[in-house]
């Protein structure tokens, strides 16, 4: 069995790491590079950086901080934010990122997934999906969630988009469960199970981690390949070394770290 991955998520705005609740009311959490180095030292398996303002503002990610992170850490990291074409993706990878993640731009032009997979290989292409449960009980996709004033509700069902993204060449899916984001009540196991049933590529769970058992649950009950979290790591509520010891005690395979 492949080891499960523990992945701190760093939302970036104006050159700083921020964190909100349900994608709203963001507060400053610290310096990008300092937090990246802290998580590297604690034994994180990889990092994900979301420039949450890039797509709503119609710009690309700032390559300068990508380069600084790449020079100082030796674990894989993924970058998302305003990647609309192969040239921008190439610049992000050239700056030092190991993977690129696309979300809103792919919803506007799904063929972008195939273009990136053809250019760099599926192993470099992550598709992030911001999903929320509607009143009719269906999970549907949101776009431009980094800016509450520009967020768009789309008619597309989350499960349909997962299937389409895979068909087009996504090498990994990150499911951001918006209803659970930042509230620390646990991952959305029901939704993740449905996505897992049709997801043939690695599935990363995001949104809702509040205690160590939540990580064990998402691995055992939803068979996620990795668990992404932000607030519990930024605040120090869950130290990564302790989390890995806890998971090993429950016979969940995780990579060596502190």
UniProtKB/Swiss-Prot annotation:
Q: Which domain of life is it from?
A: Bacteria
Question: Which residues catalyse the reaction?
Answer: 11, 130
Chief site of localization = cytoplasm
* Pathway(s) per entry: Amino-acid biosynthesis; L-histidine biosynthesis; L-histidine from 5-phospho-alpha-D-ribose 1-diphosphate: step 5/9
Reactions catalysed according to its record = 5-[(5-phospho-1-deoxy-D-ribulos-1-ylimino)methylamino]-1-(5-phospho-beta-D-ribosyl)imidazole-4-carboxamide + L-glutamine = D-erythro-1-(imidazol-4-yl)glycerol 3-phosphate + 5-amino-1-(5-phospho-beta-D-ribosyl)imidazole-4-carboxamide + L-glutamate + H(+)
GO terms for CC?
A: cytoplasm
Q: Does the keyword Amino-acid biosynthesis apply?
A: yes
The protein's matches in InterPro entries, at most eight in alphabetical order, are given as: Aldolase_TIM, His_biosynth, HisF, IGPS_HisA/HisF, RibuloseP-bd_barrel
Q: Name one Pfam family in it.
A: His_biosynth
Q: Which GO terms describe its molecular function?
A: imidazoleglycerol-phosphate synthase activity; lyase activity
Name the UniProt key words of this record, in alphabetical order.
Amino-acid biosynthesis, Cytoplasm, Histidine biosynthesis, Lyase
Where in the chain are disulfide-linked cysteines found? none
Provide the E.C. number(s) assigned to this enzyme.
4.3.2.10
Carries keyword Lyase? yes
Please cite one Gene Ontology biological process associated with this protein.
Answer: L-histidine biosynthetic process
**Which compartments does it reside in?**
Cytoplasm
HAMAP family hit by this protein? HisF
The family note in this entry says: Belongs to the HisA/HisF family.
The family database entries (PANTHER family) matched by this protein are listed as:
IMIDAZOLE GLYCEROL PHOSPHATE SYNTHASE HISHF, IMIDAZOLE GLYCEROL PHOSPHATE SYNTHASE SUBUNIT HISF/H IGP SYNTHASE SUBUNIT HISF/H
Tell me the function of this protein: IGPS catalyzes the conversion of PRFAR and glutamine to IGP, AICAR and glutamate. The HisF subunit catalyzes the cyclization activity that produces IGP and AICAR from PRFAR using the ammonia provided by the HisH subunit.
Q: How does it assemble?
A: Heterodimer of HisH and HisF.
Protein name (Swiss-Prot/TrEMBL): Imidazole glycerol phosphate synthase subunit HisF
């Amino acid at each position: 069995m492949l080891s499960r991955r523990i992945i701190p998520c760093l939302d970036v705005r104006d050159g700083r790491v921020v964190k909100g609740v349900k994608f709203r009311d963001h507060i400053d959490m610290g310096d990008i590079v300092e937090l990246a180095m802290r998580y590297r030292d604690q034994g994180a398996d990889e990092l994900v950086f979301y420039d949450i303002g890039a797509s709503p503002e119609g710009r690309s990610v700032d390559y300068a901080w990508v380069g600084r992170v790449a020079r100082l850490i030796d674990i894989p990291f993924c970058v998302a934010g305003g990647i609309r074409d192969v040239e921008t993706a190439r610049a992000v990878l050239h700056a030092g990122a190991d993977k690129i993640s696309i979300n809103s731009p792919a919803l506007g032009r799904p063929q972008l997934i195939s273009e990136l997979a053809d250019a760099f290989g599926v192993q470099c292409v992550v598709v992030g999906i911001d999903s929320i449960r509607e009143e009719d009980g269906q999970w549907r996709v949101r776009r431009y969630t980094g800016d509450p004033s520009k967020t768009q509700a789309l008619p597309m069902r989350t499960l349909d988009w997962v299937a389409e993204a895979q068909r087009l060449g996504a090498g990994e899916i990150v499911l951001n469960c918006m209803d659970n984001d930042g509230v620390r009540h646990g991952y959305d196991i029901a939704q993740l199970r449905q996505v897992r049933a049709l997801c043939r590529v690695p599935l990363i769970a995001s949104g809702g981690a509040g205690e160590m058992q939540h990580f064990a649950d998402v691995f055992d009950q939803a068979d996620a390949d990795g668990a992404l979290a932000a607030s519990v790591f930024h605040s120090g509520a869950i130290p990564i070394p302790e989390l890995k010891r806890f998971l090993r005690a429950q016979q969940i395979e995780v990579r060596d770290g502190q």
